[in-house]
């Protein structure tokens, strides 16, 4: 069957959820002060930002963000009388609310065994191996779930004095190593992270979803994380649609941390890591306007919504970031060809008004736009992997483990 769209561009607004998922009662955040576990049933990332701060997003509104099915309408994003895009929301079936699980399911995998997390910190034998390899001691007090900004505030001054490593985790299946660039170079930090990755793979006795290098600079009281972040992920456990496209000879472009999330599997052209989300949009536009990119798939992650504002529970910053992205949408649409398809979605929620600091179990919004559409409408509620099933059908490759294509509905 001839392809309907020559190029498909998928943009993940990291953590921009649109209301609690049906199984949100099984997922929890912990009150920072009382440590009480509160389920995610009342989470609603877009809804609460729209209600508390307000959102001025004329471009997303025209596309139909306000038309996405909800129990109550978005306070400051009215439904469009004639939305310019197909819209819906998608439910996750995998047993996790982390970045890897969300992205892997979007690409067609069904993760029923959640990645292990380490709420009590990492075991002593692992820390000792890292110390032996690196020749540096580890600050044991940091070895627990920690906010990335708080951990360098609390232990950065000590690291500047002693050169010890700051190793911490979160509610996600990650091991993060923070290193001040004046004390531990990026090159050294990356080597340590590569070593930790090599000893924490599946079957090693302690499996970790991602190892993350977190370089930072500055002085005590004014530390700032840099754009030198690197993620060392596991390779997907099964073949994703991204990999199927690559193997079929279809050009695949990654923007932002997509290449890290999939451990480069299925990525032909990596446009690099984003300095920030606006830089990420610039990199997407650079890919879209490449003369050689005539057919294929681009996959973009914009992480600031999550990393800078969601985890820090910054409603104002989060709302401003959404508005900034909305302001760039005309450029993205202008760069589209007549037979391009643009899909804008998320990978989980991270309600900045919610208790705790963790992701929230939510539906994700889906906007589907092409200049060729005649009368777009609201689609039935689906599942994350429907995105990749649609991409797979368009490019005549087999879908992955799960997902139902909605390609025929796009006219």
Curated annotation (Swiss-Prot):
GO terms under cellular component: cytosol
Entry's localization field: Cytoplasm
S-S bridge residues: none
Domain of life: Bacteria
GO molecular function, one term: manganese ion binding
Binding, Mn(2+) 1: 14, 347-348
Protein residues bound to Mn(2+) 2: 306, 311, 359
The enzyme's E.C. designation: 5.4.2.7
Cofactor section: Mn(2+)
Catalytic activity from the UniProt record: 2-deoxy-alpha-D-ribose 1-phosphate = 2-deoxy-D-ribose 5-phosphate; alpha-D-ribose 1-phosphate = D-ribose 5-phosphate
SUPFAM superfamilies: Alkaline phosphatase-like, DeoB insert domain-like
Keywords: Cytoplasm, Isomerase, Manganese, Metal-binding
Function: Isomerase that catalyzes the conversion of deoxy-ribose 1-phosphate (dRib-1-P) and ribose 1-phosphate (Rib-1-P) to deoxy-ribose 5-phosphate (dRib-5-P) and ribose 5-phosphate (Rib-5-P), respectively.
PANTHER family named among the record's database cross-references: PHOSPHOPENTOMUTASE
Similarity field: Belongs to the phosphopentomutase family.
Protein's recorded name: Phosphopentomutase
Species of provenance: Lactococcus lactis subsp. cremoris (strain MG1363)
Gene: deoB
